């Protein structure tokens, strides 16, 4: 379903979706965000006339999808167990159609290190980085890491979303502490050169890019609180980029998503440095769909209501 077709909900055969499980909640660190996303999408689908029901895998076993005669699954699970390919593989084995990216792409996009390695191998722009491994990490090396990556470094657990476990550091002592904290979430941690500049995100639907969004926060960086709790975070859509840069960003988002086997729908995040160069941060295969989320904002600018967007996401299920 293209963006243009998604605006014509009257042309959608709602009955063809059958009985739909909107899967949300789960056991990851992003459970609360997933609950909010899933409940919003569930309400929208029911409003559109879809036979949709909530399904929390933290409370129900997957085999109940078959026993309760569901026809397809709309995945609204964020983080581990929802975005990392494990759920996608299980559903595939059950011959249960599901929304969004498949097993390989989900696993790649969930792993910030692997996705950066793929982009780097293809010549796509991404910030300089190093990897901290819990098995052999030595805090004595932090001064050298800072000297190689620059004055400011972002510390990110390799497989967490919503900025959970992330930190921005400016010296070796802070770096060592931030890495130890990140190890509570993952055995591997991405240490990334901080790009001073503006943050952008591009939402994608079936091979098309929606208008980009720029974000502004008075906080140190766009962290969990800035994303979900703060009232001072500002979002601009359209982002204000000149048409040429908007087109460049859209093409880069599509290329990056394709490179890591993303499909259906998703979101790609960027930084733009003071010289205008864009750098890939990460790709999201199950972006948030809360009242503060970015994909619904971009979709609205593209002419899609939340209900139309939810139907378009559902339509990505094979």
Curated annotation (Swiss-Prot):
Assign the protein's first listed, main location to one coarse class: cytoplasm
Q: Which reaction does it catalyse?
A: 2 D-alanine + ATP = D-alanyl-D-alanine + ADP + phosphate + H(+)
The answer to whether keyword Protein biosynthesis applies is no
Q: Name one GO cellular component term.
A: cytosol
BP GO terms, sorted: cell wall organization; peptidoglycan biosynthetic process; regulation of cell shape
Disulfide-bond pairs as recorded: none
Q: Which stretches make up the ATP-grasp domain?
A: 116-315
E.C. number: 6.3.2.4
Give the domain of life: Bacteria
InterPro entries the UniProt entry points to: ATP-grasp, ATP_grasp_subdomain_1, D-Ala_lig_Van_CS, D_ala_D_ala, Dala_Dala_lig_C, Dala_Dala_lig_N, PreATP-grasp_dom_sf
Gene3D superfamilies xrefs:
3.40.50.20, ATP-grasp fold, A domain, ATP-grasp fold, B domain
Which coenzymes or cofactors are required?
Mg(2+); Mn(2+)
The record's GO molecular-function terms, alphabetically, read: ATP binding; D-alanine-D-alanine ligase activity; metal ion binding
Q: Which Pfam families match?
A: Dala_Dala_lig_C, Dala_Dala_lig_N
> So where does Mg(2+) 2 get bound?
282, 284
SUPFAM superfamilies the UniProt entry points to: Glutathione synthetase ATP-binding domain-like, PreATP-grasp domain
Involved pathway(s): Cell wall biogenesis; peptidoglycan biosynthesis
Name the enzyme's class: ligase
Q: What is the protein's known function?
A: Cell wall formation.
Q: Which family does it belong to?
A: Belongs to the D-alanine--D-alanine ligase family.
Q: What is this protein called?
A: D-alanine--D-alanine ligase
Gene transcribed to yield this protein: ddl
């Amino acid at each position: 379903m293209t963006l243009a077709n998604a605006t014509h909900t009257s042309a959608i055969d709602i009955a063809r979706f059958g009985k739909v499980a909107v899967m949300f909640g789960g056991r990851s660190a992003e459970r609360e965000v997933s609950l909010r996303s899933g409940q919003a999408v569930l309400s929208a689908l029911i409003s559109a006339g879809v036979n949709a029901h909530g399904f929390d895998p933290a409370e129900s076993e997957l085999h109940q999808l078959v026993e309760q005669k569901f026809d397809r699954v709309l995945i609204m699970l964020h983080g581990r167990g929802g975005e990392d390919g494990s759920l996608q593989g299980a559903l595939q084995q059950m011959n249960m159609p599901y929304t969004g990216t498949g097993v390989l792409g989900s696993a790649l996009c969930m792993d910030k290190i692997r996705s950066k390695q793929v982009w780097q191998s293809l010549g796509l722009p991404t910030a300089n980085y190093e990897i901290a491994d819990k098995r052999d990490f030595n805090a004595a090396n932090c001064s050298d890491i800072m000297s190689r990556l620059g004055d400011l470094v972002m510390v990110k657990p390799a497989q967490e979303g919503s900025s959970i476990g992330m930190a921005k550091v400016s010296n070796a002592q802070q770096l060592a502490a931030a890495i130890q904290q990140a190890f509570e979430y993952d055995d591997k941690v991405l240490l990334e050169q901080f790009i001073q500049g503006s943050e952008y995100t591009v939402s994608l639907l079936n091979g098309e890019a929606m208008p980009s969004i720029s974000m502004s926060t008075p906080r140190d960086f766009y962290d969990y609180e800035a994303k979900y709790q703060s009232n001072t975070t500002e979002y601009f859509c359209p982002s204000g980029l000149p048409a040429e840069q908007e087109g460049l960003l859209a093409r880069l988002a599509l290329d990056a998503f394709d490179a890591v086997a993303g499909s259906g729908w998703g979101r790609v995040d960027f930084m733009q440095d003071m010289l205008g160069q864009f750098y890939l941060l990460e790709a999201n295969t199950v972006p948030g769909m809360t009242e503060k989320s970015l994909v619904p904002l971009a979709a609205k600018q593209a002419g899609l209501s939340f209900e139309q967007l939810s139907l378009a996401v559902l339509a990505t299920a094979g």
